[in-house]
Amino acid sequence: MFKDNSKIINFIVDWLNDYCVQNSVEGFVVGVSGGIDSALTSTLCSMTKKPVLCIQMPIHQSKNEITRSTNHIKWLEKNFTNVISVEDNLSSVYDEFVKSKNNTSSSLTYSDEKKQLAFANTRSRLRMINLYFHATSNNYIVAGTGNKVEDFGVGFYTKYGDGGVDISPVSYTHLTLPTIAEVDRYGGT
């Protein structure tokens, strides 16, 4: 469909702008994790010139992940006047939830493996709740960070978690690492 990635980038930015106009929303909320997909998504949303709220939501994240997301957000705020950010550390909320489930006296029994999966999915769902709190409060939409393989290939996302978004700017394309470098020429990651 496109001969070079700059056309894909421009197409996505135009599509994001059109989506906002057609749906009477004012901007975007993006969860920035420190990964490539959230860096790409937040940069593309920033390129629309519409307000973008970048949110860090650590739940016992590694220092490296937090540093990467912080550095990317700082770069966005320096290069795009439409970007603001907030850090909502959800570790204590998650810990309280885990504690309540571990202390529940019940006749129900859970396998450790399934319980750990449920706790992992809970992290994603807590983040989704937080993203939508901010989006609804500002008349913004949640821009998902899932890529094509995650969203349409292997279906690697948590239902009602990181799969619970309004729009997925990078899920319909084959954007890859070289494309990230091209976006970097526009504004960087």
Regions found by a protein language model. Name each.
Residues 1-158:
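ATP-dependent adenylation/nucleotidyltransferase module used to activate substrates
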Residues 28, 180-181:
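Exposed boundary/loop context
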Residues 36, 181-183:
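Intrinsic disorder/low-complexity signal
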Residues 39-43, 163, 173:
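Ubiquitous "structural anchor" signal
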Residues 117-121, 167-172:
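Short, surface-exposed loop/turn motifs that are enriched in glycine and acidic residues
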Residues 155-170:
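A mobile, often basic/glycine-rich helix-loop segment
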Residues 173-179:
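Conserved small/polar residues in nucleotide/adenosyl-binding loops
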Residues 184-189:
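Hydrophobic alpha-helical segments, chiefly the membrane-spanning helices
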